[in-house]
Amino acid sequence: MKRRLISSGSTFEREIGYSRAVVVGDHVHVSGTTGFDYATMTIAADVAAQTTRCLQNIEAALAQAGASLRDVVRVRYILPDAADFPATWPALRAAFGEVRPAATMLQAGLADPRMRIEIEVDAVIGSGA
């Protein structure tokens, strides 16, 4: 089975050496994705706004893979400050409330101090149809 690499155009992917997503068969693995606007390489200060942008970035990668947020089966949330997590819930509920993937929230440092959340997902194409 061959794998297909998906890029968002983020400079991080090129500089570090990874793909935004990797597709193998009907499985899509989306890398940890932050709230950067990859076109401008800017990021909002607010964790809720970052969460919304994370989800938009993930949705774009999934679409390139032929999947959608409805196909997400596993999600991981990484936040430097666990106290920020409740502020993300409205955006997360809007994206995953009906999907209800398996989920984990971790508190850990991120690569840039401006990053307040990173989201990683796994999806199975067509599973949410």
For each feature predicted by the language model, list its residue ranges.
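N-terminal presequence-like segments and the immediate start of the first folded domain
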Residues: 1-56, 60-74, 79-129
